[in-house]
């Protein structure tokens, strides 16, 4: 076969022994053999491209499927009651009442964001937004979970600058508010940053759309941007293998394929075009084109339908000349959608696309057969059973083994680490902690994002959870939070995942919303490492068991493996997103103190001497070891119930969860947010260091008007929730005072808290 000859099905049958680069495409010997067994011949070049991308770790979940099934086993019918779409769809969809539905999901774009930080992050946002669009919803907000190497490491500035500009540039151009997230710096993410993007959308329940191709004769319409060479191999090579640590400081870039290139303005009109198409009832089924491009869209639509599909591949609008069928099928060019449309609606469909200046092309049709066939200028280059491509890839039950080093890690507690003893040392610890890259203000980052575009943002960064209004008439809204702790998960993956769930659940609750559903993005090292698979297995079980205890379902998510450079893996990082519902956003609870004169500060929950895995141990001693804080999910539920009742009855004027940095961090953030000072009272007999810096879970700082203090504390006592009167808001005060120990002016706190990131990256 010459270099210019197309490898057709006829040719593949006639030349069964032709050498094929299946290993270069990420397939193993036995996987290639299985493809030949399925087809009864060797695959064509185009078929090989399809199977390689769809059987990649990123698309097939071949190493995680056996563990992800645990989510289904632990989800009850009661938990599923309000779930309209779940695991397996483009994004989860939840019925939130009054005829409204919300769809949300978290996705990773980790490896591309190291190779090309701006485009990697930008297209990560664009991809997750299209997942939301594909469910029939209008996207309304985005969030992000970012993990970078040490803040002062040489390459971190390049990655941070590109990623932050990419997230902001794409999201801002779409007109979507970025309402929160997390940014973490840790040396384990050097060379392997995590860029996890969340998007949420809203629709009426009856507007739900799903990805399936049914009805023989229905047309397949590709619409959006033209197809180019960008992103080819993204899921089979870039997202499904580790970065090579050879080659000096290249990070293995020489072997990596092109990163996708995004155009947010094309996506912006694509959103409006899709919404018009939905409103007109012109769409039977729809799928966005993201990872694996047309290979994914065609095989998944056909596999979910009731027949087959035929595609005329040469009709695909291309922006590069000389593209091969394999390249067209593998391209991950952005801003593209694929719809199933009845023949009588094609003209109307095209008119809507023309109105929005969106390129649309009829590229094929649904057939009454059982195969997906694809032709190239009249010659068949693909003839496959679509389920074997989309859903019946290899499944590996990889070895799972608790690392031998785990015992030593757990035994290495913080018990022997020096603690501050004097008042001066306590003050110095506070200032060092809030100025550290681990805890300092993310204002330098978040100010690059538009948080209030569209006018429906109620709470955003620096609140614990973001809140968006979805119904102007009733005030109904949603709250979202994403959280993760790689440090705790490294110590105990089961507990670490539950701590992330507990914090995200609590962050939604402190806004006054009721937590309803969960999405996740599970970021781990190589699945070929039994120790990594043990971490993954334990984290999945911890998260699933935690959701079952709280009674909220996992609606979907993402797994990102191979997050390591050479043999060095990232900290295991299960990102958990929680969606909550608030019936009236006017009763949301803000973070800042001082809404009413002389508020009483009350600490909800118990404080213990828990410092293993804490930010204090990291900042002061560069230490990681021991046992993470205990998690009590029943207490988290009680705490959420108390906060909901307090919001409805107007009993609290501010609330802030306690997590990294403990009470000291929460007080500083709440005081600076409200631009008012306060006095903190160390309980009699309590250790000031433990009181200020413990990271015990299940705690919230609330500000209560003096007139409501008796009523509020009485409710807590009656419900069995521990509470401690911990301080008072001093109206007009210019300092935060820990009574009897030290006092720091607000100006000094703000300088320490807000000066770090601009100095590093500004």
From Swiss-Prot:
Superkingdom in the source lineage: Bacteria
GO cellular component, one term: cytoplasm
Any one GO BP annotation for this protein: 'de novo' IMP biosynthetic process
Keyword Zinc among record annotations: no
UniProt binding sites for Mg(2+) 1: 107, 558
GO molecular function, one term: phosphoribosylformylglycinamidine synthase activity
Magnesium as UniProt keyword: yes
Subcellular location: Cytoplasm
Keywords: ATP-binding, Cytoplasm, Ligase, Magnesium, Metal-binding, Nucleotide-binding, Purine biosynthesis
Active-site residue numbers: 58, 109
Function description: Part of the phosphoribosylformylglycinamidine synthase complex involved in the purines biosynthetic pathway. Catalyzes the ATP-dependent conversion of formylglycinamide ribonucleotide (FGAR) and glutamine to yield formylglycinamidine ribonucleotide (FGAM) and glutamate. The FGAM synthase complex is composed of three subunits. PurQ produces an ammonia molecule by converting glutamine to glutamate. PurL transfers the ammonia molecule to FGAR to form FGAM in an ATP-dependent manner.
Family: Belongs to the FGAMS family.
Protein name, UniProt field: Phosphoribosylformylglycinamidine synthase subunit PurL
Organism: Rhodococcus erythropolis (strain PR4 / NBRC 100887)
